[in-house]
UniProtKB/Swiss-Prot annotation:
One of its GO terms (biological process) is tRNA processing. Its EC number is 2.7.7.56. Belongs to the RNase PH family. Phosphate binds at residues 86, 124-126. Homohexameric ring arranged as a trimer of dimers. Pfam families: RNase_PH (PF01138), RNase_PH_C (PF03725). The keyword tRNA-binding applies. This is Ribonuclease PH. The keyword Mitochondrion does not apply. Keywords: Nucleotidyltransferase, RNA-binding, rRNA processing, Transferase, tRNA processing, tRNA-binding. It catalyses: tRNA(n+1) + phosphate = tRNA(n) + a ribonucleoside 5'-diphosphate. Phosphorolytic 3'-5' exoribonuclease that plays an important role in tRNA 3'-end maturation. Removes nucleotide residues following the 3'-CCA terminus of tRNAs; can also add nucleotides to the ends of RNA molecules by using nucleoside diphosphates as substrates, but this may not be physiologically important. Probably plays a role in initiation of 16S rRNA degradation (leading to ribosome degradation) during starvation.
Length: 238
């Protein structure tokens, strides 16, 4: 039995609220159960130095957690003057994942930065950030079209992500913190709405996992992510 009472294949309740903040071209509050992340998409009329003159755009991401988003207060990384390795890893993952959603040549020389700020953490913050960040990105792209800075949206496909793992010997979908902290295997799966995999990150915390467990986890991920695509679609049509 999972601590939350959910069945192995049952994800947490997910809510996606668009236009959550006033100033950004795209903004979303995404909630995976008790995990809550604000994702904003900001457009700039410039590209990184390595892309200047190439006629291509860029999608990048930044990630952070509020000091009291967890059970005990964490010091701000800005106060320490250095980002931690986990933060750098996660924001690179978010950026890689969301670049797969967009035709960067069709984006032109624009940079879109997805800022993901965790206001409450209960496991799965990076997968929530990718799922909500994609919706914020779509709104930012549509803003560029509305402002006639692009003729049409360069969106190629939607992207969503979920965590899966093996908890007390059973493959489960969308781990919350109590499960994540005890899981024998923890995996993050990022997919497109066309059925392709963007990234699979999996680690055995105890005993190695078997092929059958891997197959079961990927099947759970695909099913849960299909539900996320429906929720993204509903949010964008609202």
């Amino acid at each position: 039995m999972r601590p939350s009472g959910r069945t192995p294949e049952q994800p947490r309740d997910v809510r996606i609220t668009r236009n959550y903040t006033r100033h950004a071209e795209g903004s979303v509050l995404v909630e995976f159960g008790d995990t809550k992340v604000i994702c904003t998409a900001s457009v700039e009329n410039k590209v990184p130095p390595f892309l200047r003159g190439e006629g291509k755009g860029w999608i990048t991401a930044e990630y952070g957690m509020l000091p009291r988003s967890t059970g005990s207060r964490m010091g701000r990384e800005a106060a320490r003057g250095k980002q931690g390795g986990r933060t750098v890893e996660i924001q690179r993952l978010i950026g890689r994942s969301l670049r797969a959603a967009v035709d960067l040549e069709a984006l032109g020389e624009h940079t879109i930065t997805i800022d993901c700020d965790v206001i409450q953490a209960d496991g799965g913050t990076r997968t929530a950030a990718i799922t909500g960040g994609c919706v914020a990105l779509v709104d930012a792209l549509n803003h560029l079209v509305k402002e006639k800075r692009l003729k049409k949206s360069p969106l190629k496909q939607m992207v969503a992500a979920v965590s899966v793992g093996v908890y007390r010997g059973t493959p489960v979908a969308d781990l919350d913190y109590p499960e994540d902290s005890e899981a024998e295997t923890d995996m993050n799966v990022i997919m497109t709405d066309q059925g392709g995999f963007i990234e699979i990150q999996g680690t055995a915390e105890g005993a190695p996992f078997e092929q059958a467990e891997l197959d079961a986890m990927l099947a759970l991920a695909r099913k849960a992510i299909d539900q996320l695509f429906e929720l993204q679609k509903e949010a964008l049509s609202a």
